A protein has these predicted regions:
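Helix-breaking motifs and short loop linkers at transmembrane-helix boundaries and internal kinks
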Residues: 78, 99-105, 133, 259, ...
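Cytoplasmic helix-loop-helix junction between adjacent transmembrane helices
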Residues: 109-148, 339-340
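Helix-loop boundary and gating motifs at the non-cytosolic
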Residues: 11-60, 230-235, 240-258, 265
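Helix-loop-helix hairpin linking two adjacent transmembrane segments in secondary transporters
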Residues: 143-195, 382
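Central cavity-lining transmembrane alpha-helices of secondary-active solute carriers
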Residues: 57-71, 270-282
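Structural signature of the two symmetry-related core transmembrane helices
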Residues: 81-96, 294-309
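Juxtamembrane intracellular "pre-TM" segments in multi-pass secondary transporters
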Residues: 2-13, 198-232, 412
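C-terminal membrane-cytosol helix-exit motif in multi-pass small-molecule transporters
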Residues: 183-205, 395-403
């Protein structure tokens, strides 16, 4: 492990438990303040559809801009300092929602709140890669699943709190109560981080500012010059594009075209997330033992086929099954891609690698609803979903040609 990382932290198992606990609290806090509370709050401030979309999506822009430099910075100044910076945003920024009275302020706060995941996410993943050894796939999958659990709980609890406080007729004070709960949970994540990450990073001896800047830029250059890293990250980005498209348009299709009710549409989407949540750690363990490329390829196919079928189905049970298959495919891809990126990188560049991976992930997530929306408007659901499905399949031969799996000891 790079001396500038977490060499001064407690044992590996303790560190992993700490990261999982902090990750759960942080994602739970973030989800409380996001869906469905955030779009409704933006509407209450007078935002139209475009404004609501900007308020929800602006934090993804933050991730695109800052994940790579945050990860690379952690390679230079240490993981602990960088993670705590992200936790400070998690812990303090939600309090800013309590003072928002205008839409422009909401957009600004959302942009800054996005720094929390942009800073903490890739650095925490780098720490997991640092200490997981040959179990990168399994441990990175557990870290991701814990975050998914926080999101799964945070979103409905936030919505239920708002329902108790007035629902669609809730006033600004009702929204502020939910945001206060988010702030307190984020503060709990920060407090846990301050106590459990109390030991300092081991300083990089003999490094002045110019040398640190050189290490920072060198890490980014070496990572982005590795086409294996970029291609593997792109597979995750393309899969995430289809997931973002499904997230945006599956509920609309289910209600407006398939004739299902809103609750059924939510169940179809929810079962996909639950399957991903359950399957990821197992798929990560399998990728550690049997290789990552086969799982990524199989996962892309498992996502492509059900994605293309969705516009041709109207039965609730069948759509549920299709959603489950897509969720399994997502687990195949996401359990292996981040670990494969870490396999290709030198340990001292794990931060930059996870930052690059996270940036491409966010680009895919942001592009999915936008690109698919344009395609649906121009060509309809059937052709639009077929095009995205074709992109998933077309990426496979390029991935197999570009990426050759190597023994994991190559990066030590």
């Amino acid at each position: 492990m790079n001396p500038a990382t977490l060499t001064a932290l407690p044992t590996s198992d303790t560190t992993l438990r700490t990261l999982f606990s902090i990750g759960f609290l942080a994602r739970f806090s973030y989800a409380l303040a996001r869906n469905p509370v955030l779009p409704l709050f933006a509407a209450a401030l007078g935002a139209g559809p475009e404004g609501i979309g900007l308020a929800v999506g602006i934090s993804t822009v933050t991730g695109i801009l800052f994940k790579m430099p945050s990860g690379a910075l952690s390679d230079v100044i240490g993981r602990r300092r960088t993670m705590l910076a992200g936790l400070v945003v998690f812990g303090l920024m939600p309090f800013a929602y309590l003072f928002i009275t205008h839409y422009a302020a909401l957009v600004a706060v959302r942009f800054l709140h996005g720094l929390a995941t942009a800073i903490y996410g890739p650095v925490a993943m780098a720490v997991v890669a640092d200490i997981a050894g040959a179990r990168k796939g399994e441990m990175l999958s557990w870290f991701s699943s814990v975050g998914i659990a926080g999101t799964l709980l945070g979103a409905p609890i936030g919505g239920y709190l708002l329902f108790l406080l007035g629902g669609e007729q809730a006033g600004l004070n009702s929204y502020r109560t939910v945001f206060l709960c988010s702030a307190l949970t984020g503060a709990a994540a920060l407090t846990l981080g301050l106590f459990t990450l109390r030991n300092g990073d081991k300083p990089a001896e003999g490094k002045n500012l110019a040398q640190r800047i050189h290490l920072f830029t060198q890490g980014i250059r070496e990572v982005v010059a590795d086409r294996r890293v970029l291609m593997t990250s792109s597979m995750e980005g393309i899969q995430n594009m289809s997931m973002g498209a499904l997230e945006a348009f599956l509920p609309v299709y289910a209600v407006s075209m398939a004739g299902l009710n809103v609750f059924q549409a939510g169940l179809i989407w929810g079962v996909q997330i639950v399957v991903t949540f359950i399957a990821k750690p197992l798929m990560g363990r399998i990728s550690d033992r049997w290789g990552r490329r086969p799982l990524i390829v199989a996962g892309m196919l498992l996502c492509a086929v059900p994605f293309a079928l969705v516009p041709h189905l109207t039965d609730f049970v069948v759509l549920m099954l299709v959603g489950m298959v897509f969720g399994l495919g997502e687990a195949f891809v996401t359990s292996s891609s981040a670990a494969l990126v870490a396999d290709f990188c030198k340990a001292r560049h794990y931060g930059a690698a996870m930052g690059t991976f996270g940036t491409i992930f966010d680009v895919g997530h942001a592009a999915g609803p936008i690109v698919t929306g344009l395609l649906v408007a121009s060509l309809g659901y059937g052709a639009a979903f077929a095009i995205v499905s074709t992109l998933l399949c077309a990426s496979i031969p390029l991935f197999l040609y570009t990426v050759r799996e190597e023994p994991q000891t190559a990066n030590l």
